[in-house]
């Protein structure tokens, strides 16, 4: 196994299961003997809860506010160690409606770099808020991560988010050297989901890294604030995350510059698979009474 540091980031539509998928994959990497650092880049501070068995880890910003400033903190103040010695940090953010949460990401990453947090790690993983690819939330794309993995499903908005994130990766690909590692499909049991995910990956100039089947054992584990690998290590679902980890581990050097598509092209893809019907423009702007009068 390579000792070279790999910096990866997980993006995806809010609610797609990005944080939990990344934690289970990282738990599997730790089982393989890899030394892991997780940097949570979401104000909800839920990027490490399954690794630490906690509701939410104290964040860099909240601890800095208590101490006076981030300069008053030590690395051990913000870093916790969880399952399989995975090191965990949450950047945090301000109260809703106050300030810029993206600045918390910038502050945290700068603090971690200056205090040697990355020393000895094989992987640093950034778990980033929803599909936001601007401001501080884009820092893992602009300056840190070499590989971006997008968690998606066969639902239209998840695919839209994947395409949007690909545009962000493309923007910084030449200046920052970041690449798209691939798509990870979290099954939602929609029609032709696997085929659709593979087709979207092809359109984006990347590949479907893994199709994660839906299994209720995941919910049972999460209710106990555990990854499936810790809760039910012999289960079929635990093996799915080990397979995902093996594929990402073997993907070093293979990520590519993405080729995002237009909204029209995305809708055409959905229509090709029978997921979406061609829009009837004749009904746009018509009231119920007007449609009834026209026999529509």
Swiss-Prot record:
The modification ADP-ribosylarginine is found at residue 103. [4Fe-4S] cluster binds at residues 100, 134. Keywords: 4Fe-4S, ADP-ribosylation, ATP-binding, Iron, Iron-sulfur, Metal-binding, Nitrogen fixation, Nucleotide-binding, Oxidoreductase. It comes from the Bacteria. SUPFAM superfamilies: P-loop containing nucleoside triphosphate hydrolases (SSF52540). Signal peptide: none annotated. PROSITE patterns: NIFH_FRXC_1, NIFH_FRXC_2, NIFH_FRXC_3. The reversible ADP-ribosylation of Arg-103 inactivates the nitrogenase reductase and regulates nitrogenase activity. It catalyses: N2 + 8 reduced [2Fe-2S]-[ferredoxin] + 16 ATP + 16 H2O = H2 + 8 oxidized [2Fe-2S]-[ferredoxin] + 2 NH4(+) + 16 ADP + 16 phosphate + 6 H(+). It is an enzyme of class 1 (oxidoreductase). Its cofactor is [4Fe-4S] cluster. Binds 1 [4Fe-4S] cluster per dimer. ATP binds at residues 12-19. GO terms for molecular function: 4 iron, 4 sulfur cluster binding; ATP binding; metal ion binding; nitrogenase activity. Its EC number is 1.18.6.1. HAMAP family: NifH. Homodimer. The key enzymatic reactions in nitrogen fixation are catalyzed by the nitrogenase complex, which has 2 components: the iron protein and the molybdenum-iron protein. Belongs to the NifH/BchL/ChlL family. This is Nitrogenase iron protein.
């Amino acid at each position: 196994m390579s000792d070279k540091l790999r910096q990866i980031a997980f993006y995806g539509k809010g609610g797609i299961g990005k944080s939990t998928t990344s934690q289970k994959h990282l738990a599997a990497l730790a089982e393989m003997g890899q030394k892991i650092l997780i940097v949570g880049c979401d104000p909800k501070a839920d990027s490490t809860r399954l690794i630490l068995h906690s509701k939410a880890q104290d964040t860099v910003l909240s601890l800095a506010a208590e101490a006076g400033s981030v300069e008053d903190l030590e690395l051990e103040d913000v870093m916790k160690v969880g399952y399989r010695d995975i090191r965990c940090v949450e950047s945090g953010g301000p109260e809703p409606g106050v300030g810029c949460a993206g600045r918390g990401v910038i502050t945290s990453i700068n603090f971690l770099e200056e205090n040697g947090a990355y020393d000895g790690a094989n992987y640093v993983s950034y778990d980033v808020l929803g599909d936001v690819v601007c401001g501080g939330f884009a820092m893992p794309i602009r300056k840190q991560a070499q590989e971006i993995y997008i968690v998606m499903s066969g639902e239209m908005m998840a695919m839209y988010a994947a395409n949007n994130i690909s545009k962000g990766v493309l923007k910084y690909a030449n200046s920052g050297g970041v690449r798209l590692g691939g798509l990870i499909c979290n099954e939602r049991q929609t029609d032709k989901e696997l085929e659709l995910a593979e087709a979207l990956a092809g359109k984006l100039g990347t590949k479907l890294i893994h199709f994660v089947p839906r299994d209720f054992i995941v919910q049972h584990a999460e209710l106990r604030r555990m990854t499936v690998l810790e809760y039910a290590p012999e289960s079929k679902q635990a093996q799915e995350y080990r397979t995902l980890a093996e594929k990402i581990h073997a993907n070093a050097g293979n990520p590519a510059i993405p080729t995002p598509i237009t909204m029209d092209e995305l809708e055409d893809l959905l229509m090709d698979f029978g997921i979406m019907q061609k829009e009837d423009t004749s009904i746009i702007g018509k009231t119920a009474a007007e449609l009834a009068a026209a026999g529509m």
